[in-house]
């Protein structure tokens, strides 16, 4: 379908105010890089998500789901078809010891809400800069905790546009992986089963984790968070540090001098700079230690030369 025809079809099923055409995606990524989306849609209801999925499936339009852009690199060529953002679905509800959060809610905010209600179990998430949808997608974790530890179930949309509810076991949450990734599901909502706790003790744990994060991580620059998964028996940051790569720079992106597991945008870096630096680090670590580093960050979109 031509873009004008797609736009006409979108306007039949969605309010115009949630449709953006040729939208710069660097506005929505922590790295501040990325080309344009043909269509950037920000639905506010499950029904709108289903309508978008149905329209896309019937017309063979690719759909890319975007969380809050914290652990993703989008290439300068942008993304064809539809980019679907669920950030407007950011509600947080508390029912007894269960917190229910929309896909677009920041997991930091959900962690704070748990604290406010003296519920323990989400302290580990107090510094994770991601949305609930993204956190479930990759089983986000930090400081010894992860989503798998406390999630009860997630409500998702499958590729056929059907709404399904998956239990913790059915989500198959592993190290930075889930069935959501494997089956191309879209998380609409997640419920977390927490335990009653002492609010002061919960706050104390969160303060400690926040201090550790601020002390060790390069929060003063744009970045995509931890770049590589932890290889078995090793720490990615230690391997990179021992390869003397801290401070190594390609274009405007460098391996952080503060934490070797991060790459920071210090001077108008591009997605290409990030990708080239990632490949360079992988090659050096492989050569020095014979260890394969696999990206934790998602790299998506067209290369610039594909969209000229």
Swiss-Prot record:
InterPro entries xref list:
FAD-bd_PCMH, FAD-bd_PCMH-like_sf, FAD-bd_PCMH_sub1, FAD-bd_PCMH_sub2, MurB, MurB_C, MurB_C_sf, Oxid_FAD_bind_N
Task: Alphabetically list the UniProt keywords.
Answer: Cell cycle, Cell division, Cell shape, Cell wall biogenesis/degradation, Cytoplasm, FAD, Flavoprotein, NADP, Oxidoreductase, Peptidoglycan synthesis
**Highest taxon above the source species:** Bacteria
Recorded GO terms, molecular function? Answer: FAD binding; UDP-N-acetylmuramate dehydrogenase activity
Identify the SUPFAM superfamilies for this entry. FAD-binding/transporter-associated domain-like, Uridine diphospho-N-Acetylenolpyruvylglucosamine reductase, MurB, C-terminal domain
Task: Please report a single Pfam family linked to this protein.
Answer: MurB_C
The EC designation for this entry is: 1.3.1.98
Q: Which cofactor does it need?
A: FAD
The biological processes this protein is annotated with in GO are: cell division; cell wall organization; peptidoglycan biosynthetic process; regulation of cell shape
Compartments annotated for it: namely: Cytoplasm
Q: Where is the active site?
A: 176, 226 (proton donor), 296
Reactions catalysed according to its record: UDP-N-acetyl-alpha-D-muramate + NADP(+) = UDP-N-acetyl-3-O-(1-carboxyvinyl)-alpha-D-glucosamine + NADPH + H(+)
Q: GO CC annotations?
A: cytosol
Q: Which family does it belong to?
A: Belongs to the MurB family.
Job of this protein: Cell wall formation.
User: Which HAMAP family does this one have?
Assistant: MurB (MF_00037)
- Name this polypeptide is given: UDP-N-acetylenolpyruvoylglucosamine reductase
Q: Which organism is it from?
A: Staphylococcus carnosus (strain TM300)
Q: What is the lineage of its organism?
A: Bacteria, Bacillati, Bacillota, Bacilli, Bacillales
- Gene from which the chain derives: murB
């Amino acid at each position: 379908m031509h873009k004008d025809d797609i736009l006409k079809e979108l306007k039949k099923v969605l309010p115009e105010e949630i449709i953006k055409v040729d939208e710069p995606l660097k506005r929505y990524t922590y790295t501040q890089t990325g080309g344009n989306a043909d269509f950037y849609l920000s639905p506010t209801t499950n029904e709108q998500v289903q309508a978008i999925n149905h329209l896309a499936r019937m017309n063979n339009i690719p759909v890319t789901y975007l969380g809050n852009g914290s652990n993703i690199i989008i290439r300068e060529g942008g993304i064809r078809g539809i980019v679907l953002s669920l950030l407007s679905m950011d509600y947080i509800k508390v029912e007894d010891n269960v917190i229910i959060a929309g896909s677009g809610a920041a997991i930091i905010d959900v962690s704070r809400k748990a604290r406010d209600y003296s519920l323990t179990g989400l302290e580990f998430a107090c510094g994770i800069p991601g949305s609930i949808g993204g956190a479930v997608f990759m089983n986000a974790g930090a400081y010894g905790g992860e989503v798998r530890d406390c999630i009860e179930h997630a409500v998702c949309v499958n590729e056929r546009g059907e709404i399904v509810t998956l239990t913790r076991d059915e989500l198959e949450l592993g190290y930075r992986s889930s069935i959501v990734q494997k089956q191309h599901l879209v998380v609409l909502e997640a419920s977390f089963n927490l335990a009653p706790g002492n609010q002061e003790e919960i706050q104390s744990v969160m303060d400690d984790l926040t201090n550790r994060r601020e002390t060790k991580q390069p929060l003063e620059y744009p970045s995509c968070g931890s770049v590589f998964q932890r290889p078995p028996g090793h720490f990615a940051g230690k391997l990179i540090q021992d390869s003397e790569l801290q401070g190594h720079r390609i274009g405007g992106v460098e391996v952080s001098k503060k934490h070797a597991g991060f790459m920071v945008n210090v001077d108008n870096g591009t997605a290409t700079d990030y990708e080239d630096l990632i490949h360079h680090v992988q090659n050096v670590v492989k050569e020095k230690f014979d260890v394969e580093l696999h990206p934790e960050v998602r790299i998506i979109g067209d290369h610039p030369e594909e969209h000229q």
